[in-house]
A protein has these predicted regions:
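Conserved metal-binding segment of the jelly-roll/cupin
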Residues: 118-132
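A short hydrophobic beta-strand segment most commonly corresponding to one strand
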Residues: 95-98, 126, 141-156
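C-terminal, beta-strand-rich globular interaction domains
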Residues: 128-129, 150, 160-163
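Short coil/turn motifs at secondary-structure junctions
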Residues: 103, 134, 151-155
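A short beta-strand-loop-beta hairpin characteristic of the jelly-roll/cupin
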Residues: 100-121
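A short, compositionally biased micro-patch
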Residues: 77, 101-103, 128-130, 138
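Short beta-strand His + acidic residue motifs that chelate non-heme Fe in jelly-roll/DSBH
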Residues: 83-86, 108-110, 127, 133-139
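Fe(II)/2-oxoglutarate oxygenase catalytic core
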Residues: 1-87, 93, 105-108, 144, ...
Length: 237
C-alpha cells in the first residue's frame, strides 16, 4: 500500500498542503519550521482531521485501520537542511517512518542514539523517540515520509490504561490543524499567543533587560511560574 500513500502525499505536496504552521500554533514542532520542515496531519490521537479525510481518504483509511497508530502525518524536509538533536520527553509511544519520496541516498539520514538510518522509498523504520535523535539531508532532493506515533507496548494493563489516559489528555491539548477551520488545542493556542506576545515585546524586553539586569534575573522565574499557573488553570481548570 505504500505506493497508494505516496500518490496521495505527493498530490498534497504538489498542491502546497504540506506546509508549516502559518499561525505559529504548533508547539510540538515549532523549532522545526525554521529549518524548512513541513507537515500535513492525518490523525492526532483521537480521530482523523477533516481536511485529511477529504484530501487523502485512502491513507486515512489505512492509518485508521490500525488501532495502535495514535498520530500520523506526512513530513517533509528540503534538501540541504537538518534538524538539531532533540528527544520526546513523554515515553508513551514509538516513532515510525515510511519512506515515500526520498533521495534514496545515505546522505539523507536520521541518527538515533548514534545509530544511522538512511530513508529509502517504500522502506520503513521504527525507533524510540525518547533517545536523542537528529536528521541531516545533505542532498538537493526533498524528503517526504509517513510519520506515525505508535502506542508503546507496556508490561501491564494498568500501565497501558494510564498511558492511554495521559496520551488522550495531551492529544486534545495539542490538537493541530491543517486548515483554518479546524480545532486547535489549548497548548497550541497558548503557544501561538506566546509567540505573538514575544514578537511584539521582544525589543522592549531586551532594552529593559540591558538597563535592569539584576531585576530581570529576579523577575524572570517569578513570571515563568505565573504563566505556568495561568496555563494550567486554562487547560485543566
Amino acid at each position: 500500500n505504500w505506493e497508494v500513500i505516496r500518490e496521495e502525499a505527493m498530490h498534497l505536496f504538489d498542491e502546497g498542503y504540506i506546509r508549516a504552521a502559518e499561525k505559529n500554533n504548533d508547539a510540538g514542532f515549532g523549532s522545526f519550521f525554521k529549518k524548512g520542515w513541513k507537515r500535513f496531519y492525518l490523525k492526532w490521537y483521537d480521530k482523523p482531521l477533516p481536511s485529511a479525510e477529504a484530501l487523502c481518504p485512502k491513507t486515512v483509511e489505512l492509518v485508521s485501520a490500525i488501532p495502535n497508530v495514535k498520530g500520523a502525518m506526512f513530513a517533509l524536509l528540503p534538501g540541504g537542511s537538518h534538524l538539531n538533536p532533540h528527544r520526546d520527553p513523554f515515553a508513551g509511544s514509538l516513532r515510525y517512518h515510511l519512506g515515500l519520496s526520498t533521495p534514496n541516498s545515505d546522505a539523507c539520514r536520521i541518527f538515533v542514539d548514534g545509530q544511522e538510518y538512511a530513508w529509502r522509498d517504500g522502506e520503513d523504520v521504527m525507533f524510540d523517540e525518547t533517545y536523542v535523535h537528529w536528521v541531516k539531508n545533505e542532498t538537493e532532493i526533498t524528503r517526504v515520509i509517513l510519520f506515525c506515533d505508535i502506542e508503546r507496548p507496556l508490561s501491564s494493563r494498568l500501565m497501558t490504561r494510564i498511558n492511554r489516559w495521559v496520551s488522550a489528555q495531551l492529544g486534545r491539548a495539542t490538537a493541530p490543524q491543517n486548515l483554518d477551520d479546524e480545532r486547535v488545542g489549548g497548548i497550541n493556542q497558548a503557544y501561538a499567543w506566546s509567540k505573538r506576545f514575544s514578537d511584539s515585546f521582544s525589543g522592549v524586553v531586551k532594552q529593559w533587560k540591558r538597563r535592569h539586569p539584576q531585576l530581570y534575573r529576579i523577575l524572570r522565574p517569578v513570571l515563568a511560574v505565573v504563566v505556568l499557573v495561568v496555563l494550567w488553570k486554562w487547560l485543566f481548570g
